[in-house]
Curated annotation (Swiss-Prot):
HAMAP family (UniProt xref): DeoC_type1
Pfam families registered for this protein in UniProt: DeoC (PF01791)
A cellular-component GO term for this protein: cytoplasm
Catalysed reaction equations from the record: 2-deoxy-D-ribose 5-phosphate = D-glyceraldehyde 3-phosphate + acetaldehyde
Function noted in UniProt: Catalyzes a reversible aldol reaction between acetaldehyde and D-glyceraldehyde 3-phosphate to generate 2-deoxy-D-ribose 5-phosphate.
Source organism of this protein record: Streptococcus pyogenes serotype M28 (strain MGAS6180)
Compartments in which it is found: Cytoplasm
This protein's name: Deoxyribose-phosphate aldolase
Stated family: Belongs to the DeoC/FbaB aldolase family. DeoC type 1 subfamily.
Amino acid sequence: MEVKDILKTVDHTLLATTATWPEIQTILDDAMAYETASACIPASYVKKAAEYVSGKLAICTVIGFPNGYSTTAAKVFECQDAIQNGADEIDMVINLTDVKNGDFDTVEEEIRQIKAACQDHILKVIVETCQLTKEELIELCGVVTRSGADFIKTSTGFSTAGATFEDVEVMAKYVGEGVKIKAAGGISSLEDAKTFIALGASRLGTSRIIKIVKNEATKTDSY
């Protein structure tokens, strides 16, 4: 797999709580220059970012982030507001308290409501795999499939661990047809990226890959 093919799967990400507009601009510029799938940024920057890229790049943002325990109504509003401001893709965090209470019906209904608010925009569902048992992850693969979401996503990157090969293997085995997989959190090498893709991920959330590619390009004058 060529580096360009890896980059096309990347949501180039900056979600730091202290992110400044110049830092966001750099993320956007790099994402456009390297033709990544999107740039994933805080919702407060979406409107300005959408105007800045002027349709040249998909803008992704997060809702219910990073803990997921805001109400469904609040998440629906966040989704609608983000889309109105120019977001193309939404990454939502599920309410893990519902999962731990065994209330998967509530999780599914919340995702359905947010998908309806998304309309034809892409919805990715963050399940925070590092906080799940294997059985819970398998159950959530079914929940996300039934809900109509476009992607199941491993991690926020703000919890105890990010994506693992094992979790992506489970997702690939149990998620339904038509639902894609996004691996995110801790992807820090091109080899890891290739492995996640080989295991079934079609989108990668990372802030590091472009830096690695730039370093390699300095050595070889190309990517």
